[in-house]
From Swiss-Prot:
Residues 132-153 are annotated as: Disordered. Belongs to the AP2/ERF transcription factor family. ERF subfamily. Pfam families: AP2. It comes from Arabidopsis thaliana. Residues 29-86 bind DNA. Probably acts as a transcriptional activator. Binds to the GCC-box pathogenesis-related promoter element. May be involved in the regulation of gene expression by stress factors and by components of stress signal transduction pathways. InterPro entries: AP2/ERF_dom (IPR001471), AP2/ERF_dom_sf (IPR036955), DNA-bd_dom_sf (IPR016177). Keywords: Activator, DNA-binding, Ethylene signaling pathway, Nucleus, Transcription, Transcription regulation. One of its GO terms (molecular function) is transcription cis-regulatory region binding. It comes from the Eukaryota. One of its GO terms (biological process) is positive regulation of leaf senescence. This is Ethylene-responsive transcription factor RAP2-10. One of its GO terms (cellular component) is nucleus. Residues 135-145 have a biased composition (Basic residues).
Length: 196
């Protein structure tokens, strides 16, 4: 016969496990990232065959940190890497760069990997920040910047690439779908101040 304590232990164990999993998902929703006490998300990755880590940066959103991690792990391990967002790098190959690359047979430098990962993370953070007050939607969309096409499947925001006039919002200047950082300490030109 079971005692009340044994029954309580059996019943509470799954609830504790579910709560622990939920807490872990909230604190670390993606591989290779963690949240600082003050709310910033950071990404880092261990170098292959070494004890040292490559610092990938600090980001406002977990998605930006996870995308930076994905970029770094893809450069280090190639197409066989376990990614947070594998659909974003499907069919992509690494060419050129820091020291030969995954396909070139050489090792990439940690600085090159850090730089590439930080670029991707910063782009995702900028898209998230630019869209925070704008047009939200939950669809996959494709952007074109110059000669580079990329698919942004995990952004909840849309940038209107057909926008012909420049508009300024939350410290960013948006012209023809591209974002520029506006210096908020600089006084506007008298000629163009009415246009913004």
């Amino acid at each position: 016969m079971e005692t009340a304590t044994e029954v309580a232990t059996v019943v509470s164990t799954p609830a504790v496990t579910v709560a622990a999993v939920a807490t872990r998902k909230r604190d670390k929703p993606y591989k290779g990232i963690r949240m600082r006490k003050w709310g910033k998300w950071v990404a880092e990755i261990r170098e292959p065959n070494k004890r040292s880590r490559i610092w990938l940066g600090s980001y406002s959103t977990p998605e930006a940190a996870a995308r930076a991690y994905d970029t770094a792990v893809f450069y280090l391990r190639g197409p066989s890497a376990r990614l947070n967002f594998p659909e974003l790098l499907a069919g992509v190959t690494v060419t050129g760069g820091g020291g030969g690359g995954v396909n070139g047979g050489g090792d990439m430098s940690a600085a090159y990997i850090r730089r590439k990962a930080a670029e991707v993370g910063a782009q995702v953070d900028a898209l998230e920040a630019a869209g925070a007050g704008g047009n939200r939607h939950h669809h996959h969309h494709q952007h074109q910047r110059g000669n580079h096409d990329y698919v942004d499947n995990h952004s909840d925001y849309r940038i209107n690439d057909d926008l012909m006039e420049c508009s300024s919002k939350e410290g960013f200047k948006r012209c023809n779908g591209s974002l520029e950082r506006v210096d908020l300490n600089k006084l506007p030109d008298p000629e163009t101040s009415d246009d913004d």
